[in-house]
């Protein structure tokens, strides 16, 4: 089974449980918080990924670490993921879970990537425009990519809107190559 399939299977199972318990949003918040803690601390991440640590010890540690900090659904889910040695997939499971919640709520996930933060006003304007084009509510996350020269990229569902300077330069280059302008034509 591929990484993508594994994370989808676990995310779908959690989604079904959360839907039955009418706790889609709270389950997402709890899972997001725990994944953030697990993957922000190198010691915790290495512990759960280490082949040297006994699997039953990892499971007990996971159960104790989420006890009282998460609902029964999320606590049992984290314990199951650790028991099945799927800890590495938790970030992907979270993303697939979010996508599932978005589908159920007729919502799209919008990711804006830019060199620097665009600011609230620009993000709101982009959100409003995309929301009206797609006819659904949009959940926005903003990321920075220092490799961008300027501009931004928007990822929504399976679409990419590339308004980066690099894309514009590539388009200009391609147009010039298509016209086959001879060298020295602008002298």
Swiss-Prot record:
Transmembrane segments: none annotated. SUPFAM superfamilies: N-terminal domain of the delta subunit of the F1F0-ATP synthase. GO terms for cellular component: plasma membrane; proton-transporting ATP synthase complex. It is a peripheral membrane protein. InterPro entries: ATP_synth_OSCP/delta_N_sf, ATPase_OSCP/dsu. Disulfide bonds: none annotated. F-type ATPases have 2 components, F(1) - the catalytic core - and F(0) - the membrane proton channel. F(1) has five subunits: alpha(3), beta(3), gamma(1), delta(1), epsilon(1). F(0) has three main subunits: a(1), b(2) and c(10-14). The alpha and beta chains form an alternating ring which encloses part of the gamma chain. F(1) is attached to F(0) by a central stalk formed by the gamma and epsilon chains, while a peripheral stalk is formed by the delta and b chains. This is ATP synthase subunit delta.
């Amino acid at each position: 089974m591929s990484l993508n399939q594994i994370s989808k299977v676990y995310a779908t199972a959690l989604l079904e449980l959360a839907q039955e318990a009418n706790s889609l949003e709270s389950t997402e918040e709890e899972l997001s918080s725990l994944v953030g803690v697990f993957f922000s601390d190198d010691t915790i991440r290495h512990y759960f990924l280490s082949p040297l640590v006994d699997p039953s010890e990892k499971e007990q540690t996971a159960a104790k670490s989420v006890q009282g900090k998460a609902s029964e659904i999320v606590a049992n889910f984290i314990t199951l993921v650790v028991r099945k040695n799927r800890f590495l997939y938790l970030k992907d499971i979270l993303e697939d879970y979010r996508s599932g919640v978005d589908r159920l709520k007729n919502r799209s996930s919008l990711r804006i990537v830019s060199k620097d933060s665009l600011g609230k006003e620009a993000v709101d304007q982009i959100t409003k425009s995309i929301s009206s084009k797609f006819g659904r509510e949009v959940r926005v996350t903003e990321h920075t990519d220092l490799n961008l020269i300027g501009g931004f990229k928007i990822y929504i569902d399976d679409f990419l809107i590339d308004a980066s300077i690099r894309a514009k330069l590539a388009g200009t280059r391609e147009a010039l190559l298509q016209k086959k302008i001879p060298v020295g034509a602008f002298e």
